[in-house]
Amino acid sequence: MDVEQNGGRFDLIILGASGFTGKYVLREALKFLNTPSSPLKSIAIAGRSPQKLTQALQWASRPNPPPSLPILTADTADPSSLRSLCARTGLLLNCVGPFRLHGKPVVAACAAAGCNYLDISGEPEFMERVEAAHHELAVEAGALVVSACGFDSVPAELGVMFNSRQWVGSAAPNRVEAYVALESEKRIVGNFATYESAVLGVANAHQLQQLRRSRPRKPRPQ
C-alpha cells in the first residue's frame, strides 16, 4: 500500500473507495485487476482519509493480503485535488454520495480535463443538472460522463438487453416493464448515504420539476 501525492498514471481511480459502497466496488475491481485478460492493469484509490482507504483495501482483499495500490488524497470540496486526479487517469469512478452534495465538482473536473467519468448515483436531479451544466464542455474535451452505474439502473438495463435479444428481425417492443426480486440469506439493509440521498431527493422534488420545465424538451424516440 503506497500513500502518495504525485506520480504515475492509472487506468482507473476509485474515488470514495472507503465508503460503504466504495469498498464493494474496490473488491470487484481487484478481481478484474488480477485477471490476465483484464484491460485494467493499474488502479489507484482516492479519498479524504488515507487511513480509512488502507483499511478498505485490507477489507476488500480478504482473505488475501492487500496488493500494493497507490492511495491518493482528494476531497470533493477541493477542486485542485480533483484536477490532480483527472490528470492521472483516463477513468474516474465516483462513489462519493449523496451526489447532490458532493458530485458536481467531480463531474466539472472530469469534463474540463477530458477524463471519463462513472458514478453509482441514483439521483435524477443531480444527473440532469450536471448534463445541463457540463454536456458541451465534456463533448469538446472528449470526456464521457455516465451516471447511474449502480443497482438503481443496472438490473433494469440488463433486463432490457436480455428482452431485446429475444426479438427476431425488425420486430421490437416499444415498452418494457421490469421487476426486480431480491433473495438473500442475510437481512437486506441500506446505508446512511443511500437514505440521505432518498430523503434529499424527495424533499427537493420541486427543484427537479423546475429544472425539467426550464430545459428544452427532447424529441421522443421513433
PLM regions: where:
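Conserved Rossmann-fold cofactor-binding substructure of NAD(P)-dependent oxidoreductases
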Residues: P70-H102
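Conserved beta-strand positions in the Rossmann-like core of class I SAM-dependent methyltransferases
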Residues: K41-I45
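N-terminal Rossmann NAD(P)H-binding glycine-rich loop of SDR-like oxidoreductase domains
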Residues: G7-N34
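ADP-ribose/adenylate-binding Rossmann-like module
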Residues: P98, V107-M127
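Rossmann-fold NAD(P)-binding glycine/threonine-rich loop
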Residues: G103, S121-A143
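Eukaryotic N-terminal low-complexity, Ser/Thr- and Lys/Arg-rich leader segments
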Residues: M1-R9, P36-S38, R62-N64
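N-terminal Rossmann-fold cofactor-binding loop
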Residues: A46-P50, D75-T76
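Active-site-lining helix/loop region of Rossmann-like oxidoreductase modules
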Residues: R165-Q222
